[in-house]
Amino acid sequence: MSFIREFKEFVMRGNVIDLAVAVVIGAAFGKIVTALVDKIISPLIGVMVGGIDFSKLSLTLKAATVDTAGKEVPAVVIGYGDFLNTILQFIIIAFAIFIIVKMINKVTNKQPLPPETPSEDVLLLREIRDSLKK
């Protein structure tokens, strides 16, 4: 089988196409969550805790300076505000995926059917077998 034919069969399998659709939808959902966190949730939390803009939170390790040649040396800063926003985005996405998986599992995990009771013929044959063992 040629390489191209094998690749075509691989791509045309249902699981690969489902995965591709899931990746595209996931990317779009990620953008929605990013906008939700950056434009709605973070500003609301910021207002509640005293007008803080979470995306601008940072820790300055070394202030900006001007060197002997007159050039500005930028500050060394750890911008943890964006990191906090990213953690919040992750939590929202993980929770949404958890809910979706939980619903899918609920739909697909149906109660197993009770085992069938053996027919009269089978019961009679078992009785004969058991009596012959004695």
From Swiss-Prot:
It is a multi-pass membrane protein. SUPFAM superfamilies: Gated mechanosensitive channel. Keywords: Cell inner membrane, Cell membrane, Ion channel, Ion transport, Membrane, Transmembrane, Transmembrane helix, Transport. One of its GO terms (cellular component) is plasma membrane. It is found in: Cell inner membrane. The chain crosses the membrane at residues 16-36, 81-101. It comes from the Bacteria. InterPro entries: Mechanosensitive_channel_CS, MS_channel, MSC/AndL, MscL_channel. PROSITE patterns: MSCL (PS01327). One of its GO terms (molecular function) is mechanosensitive monoatomic ion channel activity. Belongs to the MscL family. Channel that opens in response to stretch forces in the membrane lipid bilayer. May participate in the regulation of osmotic pressure changes within the cell. Homopentamer. This is Large-conductance mechanosensitive channel. It comes from Xylella fastidiosa (strain M12). The gene is mscL.
